[in-house]
């Protein structure tokens, strides 16, 4: 009975060790360690959510990056526009020729705006609006909440519209329309104002892009930390398990031999009586 009990215990330990070696885990279910299992499963869930949020922020960053590049292009074109209007302030300048250049620049601005979308998301051509994206999760006690980042989209279309209202060949000093300059000096002021707006738009989107990148880096660090924590709780020490497996295999062989010898003992005694 002792030999059989020993063999059964060795076989059970051997099976458990083989499971740990094959899975790489020392805690595979709540049966192994309820507290560690519950904590590790929660941490795994958070890690998975962080990875999904990171993927979402990647798409957001790409949209913002595209919008920023568009804003920088519009800013460069608006700068060139203002320079041409400044040139027109001189005497003897053919305003019609300068206006043709300005019209071309306005068209280029429109093209840049139309191409500044990513995956259908437009952050540059509508009225400025607040955009909110999920940036992470927060756990306090038993409370779960999502954290967010908000930023402003920009309106480059208004810049294009304002610049298109400048017509150096049709200045009207008697005009009462505040959206249309009526002198060369006013035209330059209009152009400079829109250049400033374009620079502000590019700067705002650049700051937002940097913020998103920082949050993505932070999420990477959090995910690595959570994964390391889970590993420390549930992963098996493979060197120890391999040594234990080898020792248990030897014990199994010895226990099997002991049981075999125990089973043969009654037969040996009976053979003595036969003699």
Predicted regions mapped to residue ranges:
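Amphipathic alpha-helical coiled-coil/heptad-repeat segments
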Residues: 1-2, 8-12, 22, 26-236, ...
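Short loop/turn microsegments at loop-to-beta-strand junctions
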Residues: 119, 245-246
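Extended, low-aromatic, Leu/Ala- and acidic/polar-enriched alpha-helical coiled-coil segments
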Residues: 242, 248-249, 253-256
